Each structure stands twice: as C-alpha cells, then as structure tokens.
C-alpha cells in the first residue's frame, strides 16, 4: 500500500494511492488520527480498511505531495552505509557507519526545490531510501526488527559536502 501525505487547496491530509487516485482517509479519521504519523502507530491496516469505502477520492494530479511523515520525532541518517559509496568518496574503511541527523523542516515534498546555502560550492543531492519506524523498541533482536517498520519511502537528500566532516 502506498501511503501519502498531501495538500489540496491549502488543506493537508493523507491517504493511499491506487493508480492515479488518492483515497483521502485523513478526512475520515482526522478526529482521532490528525496525521499519518498518528495513524501508523495504531493498527493502521484495520483503520484504513474500515474507512476506505466511504472516504473521498482525489486525483493524484490535483495534489501537492509532501514528505509522508511531516512531523517526525527523529530523522536518523546513516552515512557511508555501503562499500561502493565509501570508495566513491575516498573515505577510509570504518567498522561502523556514520550516523547523523536531519531535521523535520529540512524535508521537501515532490517537485519542491532544495535549498543550497550561498556559501557552499559543493552541494550534492541524491535519492535515498527512508525507513519509517512504526513502533519503537529497545535492543530489538535482528529477527524482529522488521516488525517495527511501518513502511519505506523515497527521500531527497541534499548535502553540503564542503562543510561535511565524517
């Protein structure tokens, strides 16, 4: 299921995509689940199926897509997490990948422009895979880790390489 957060006519909502249509379940669940983040913490498949038949539909072409989770608690990124990228950057081998943060206000929606500081001469952008955690935990065994994943998303990443230190 492709879940999305979007705006239409200045109003934010969320839903799921089916071909070229979004089923706007946010309109149906707004009183208890005002955004997608609050929905994925619950038994969201059951909630979606219970409201899908009566939810309004909107054309995908009539909305502006936003980041799926517009208000994340944390954005934890992993740098140098695969060997070919490490070699490409000329970095030495490391035992553990580098972790760094992003902030919610640095996210952009589909088709939005990325912000580049005028002071940078080495702005780099690339597509990344975002893993959206639906339920937290501590010291989760590897064989149980995917039980905590709510979904995946494409993610725009912009880096000011001349300021980067890792």
PLM ranges: what are they?
Residues 72-166:
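Glycine-enriched loop-and-adjacent helix/strand subsegments that border the catalytic/binding cleft
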Residues 1-97:
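N-terminal non-catalytic cap/leader segment that marks the start of a structured domain
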């Amino acid at each position: 299921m492709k879940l999305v957060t979007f705006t239409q006519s200045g109003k934010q909502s969320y839903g799921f995509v089916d071909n070229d249509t979004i089923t706007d379940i946010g309109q149906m669940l707004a009183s208890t689940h005002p955004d997608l983040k609050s929905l994925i913490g619950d038994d969201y498949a059951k909630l979606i199926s219970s409201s899908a038949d009566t939810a309004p539909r909107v054309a995908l072409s009539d909305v502006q897509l936003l980041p799926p989770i517009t208000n994340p608690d944390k954005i934890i990124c992993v740098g140098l997490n695969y060997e070919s990228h490490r070699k490409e950057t000329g970095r030495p081998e490391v035992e553990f990948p580098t972790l760094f943060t992003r902030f919610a206000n640095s996210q952009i929606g589909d088709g939005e422009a990325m912000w580049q500081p005028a002071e940078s001469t080495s702005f780099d952008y690339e597509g990344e895979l975002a893993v959206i955690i639906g339920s937290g935990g501590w010291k989760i065994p590897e064989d149980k880790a995917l039980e905590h994943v709510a979904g995946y998303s494409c993610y725009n990443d912009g880096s000011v390489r001349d300021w980067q230190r890792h």
